[in-house]
């Protein structure tokens, strides 16, 4: 899904398991578990973020056998230094995370995994539009985890985010629901994807959100040197 250079190593990433270590010539060395830190059943997200100030890698994982989501922080030398557990009794589709100043933001949409349906060969994803989406702001350096709620929506990818005047500002690609219904004739999805900007007030817990533009887009990115910081340009 993605490629990462961090701590003097080159990784190929996917969110279903351990990363693969590669050579500079892109030959596969094998699975990498950070010298035993990752256990069987662990994984790393395919879209981790690197703090431009400290060089730390911020990533995450979900396990089927644990009722929580784990945020992992790995220092610039590639050594795991902190794990933060976030209660999450239902397994949701969480594909990305975003660094916002001293916080890490996770979208927890009402798009849930149903392992029993998956084992029977049925559609394993449940969409519950009557359930609010939850936005989770996790302090990287300790402190209370903050929870926010908005009407249901779905998102695969962030663009960037930052902290300003007691608020977290997050730019991301918004969708109305999980996008697994396709038009069989054209191959195009039936719903649009637009850039949105969400603002979380850390004091009042108020959430505001607005569409940035009407352009259909995906795979939003920004200059990684400004990850988690105020920025001017994004690409999608």
Regions found by a protein language model. Name each.
Residues 1-236:
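Beta-propeller domains
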